[in-house]
Amino acid sequence: YEERGQYAVLLKPRTDNRDGEHEIQSRIGLAAPAEYVDDFMKKISELWDTREAEYLYHGKKVNAILVDEAQFLSPEEVDTLSDIVDFYEIPVLCYGLRTDFLNHLFPGSRRLMEIADVIEEVPTVCWCGKRAQCNTRYSNGKIVREGAQIMLGSNESYVALCRKHYKEGKLWK
């Protein structure tokens, strides 16, 4: 959007505080300023109470909304984002995981799966070369099979595995 001279609002759930309060980062080190979803929604409910031709935010016309770590959204936040698409005709693109380390849907992911117009999977590959569909939590070289669904800032790590190697507990060759 930026390359095309358009303005995209970057958002993240308040749960995601790993990269600092007002920033999102990629695994390769790219960073961009972002706002918390709930703060944005409070502001727009005040700003956009009328149906205008252009919806402004920070003095700029909003062309799109991008949400990082969308799995951490609440179902209600997902519904509000769908209202932005339907009633304000602003595209909302959400990026995140489908399932947790136990292969259960996150509540935000579940709601996105239920109402999203389009779902595109970005394929990830297991160490064996097969499609990785399991976000595997591990600690001390062993797969973790119990614990809190959301674990930020812990000593545990995550690796993408195919379902077979997840079931077998094989983190690598």
Predicted feature locations:
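Walker B catalytic acidic pair
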Residues: 68-70
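Conserved P-loop
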Residues: 1-55, 100-111, 121-124, 143-145, ...
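Sensor-1/coupling segment of RecA-like P-loop NTPase cores
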Residues: 85-108
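Short basic (Lys/Arg) and small-residue
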Residues: 116
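Conserved catalytic network of the ASCE P-loop NTPase/AAA+ motor domain
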Residues: 55-59, 84-88
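Conserved AAA+ ATPase core "coupling" helix
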Residues: 123-143
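Conserved D-loop-proximal element of ABC-family nucleotide-binding domains
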Residues: 75-76
